Amino acid sequence: YGGTPLYLQQINEKESFEENIKRTYLKVTSYLYEEALLLLRQEVQEPGVYSAIIEAIASGYTKANEISTKIGEDSAKCLKYIKILCELGILHKETPFGEKESSRKTIYGISDFMFRFWYRYVFTNRTLIETGAQQVVWEKRIKPDYCSYMGLVFEKVCMDYLNSKNARGELPILYTSIGRWWGTNAATHGQEEIDLIANDGKDYLFGECKWRNEKLDISVLKDLKAKADVFRINRKNSYYVLFSKSGFTEAVLNEVRSDDSILLVDLAELMTSC
């Protein structure tokens, strides 16, 4: 639903998550059924092109050249439209932590969570929805995919949590920059990703965010430490924070008891801090 108060007002606390989604998104008469397209028509000319850009990103085409190829538009024109969508707060530009804004690894994502949900689940299923197949859309398209969708949403919540803690000086470092990192690990020659990384110039904080139904295991911590070695040069101290929807295994809890460089944050802690 994003953070728009009017959208949040559509939520009925007496209904289940499934019931709320079906009522607010999956009927042709739903309040949010055409909201994304209506907003685009109000804000931009050629809403069809802008919509195609957002659809491409929602489908996994996140680099500028991928987007322009997908929608069949000139790359310069496409970048102009992407910039406008960024200015509107619908999209955002992202580069791997520590790299320049002009990096060739730059990608674009959907910032507005209502747009992100709409283009992932409503736009692509409009034909089904318009034939009254809302239950099928929920069971076959949304429910099996929702944990994957929530991954990036959870990362954003975790970053907001760290920013709040950092502002109050409640972390082991007082970082001046935070972000996400992806790229090639020179040691393994494989593609790696670190969900959250922050530093204050000499000390680093590395984070992993898991929106899963099972407890986070010790293997996740070991993998995070291995990936963090990419930043071993000029690094004085390292700290690790693990975020988990479903808590932690006993092995992780035992590790934390003997290592104060590891922080654990579960869903209850995140909810308390919101």
Describe each model-derived feature in a short phrase.
Residues C86-G98:
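A short, conserved structural fragment
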Residues G60-K70:
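Short acidic, hydrophobic short linear motifs in intrinsically disordered regions
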Residues Y1-L39:
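Amphipathic alpha-helical "lid/sensor" segments that cap RecA-like P-loop NTPase cores
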Residues E35-E46, E66:
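Short amphipathic alpha-helical boundary/capping segments
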Residues T106-C274:
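A cross-kingdom feature that marks ATP-driven nucleic-acid transaction machinery
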Residues P47-A58, M159:
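Hydrophobic residues on short alpha-helical segments
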Residues I71-L88:
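Short amphipathic alpha-helical interaction segments
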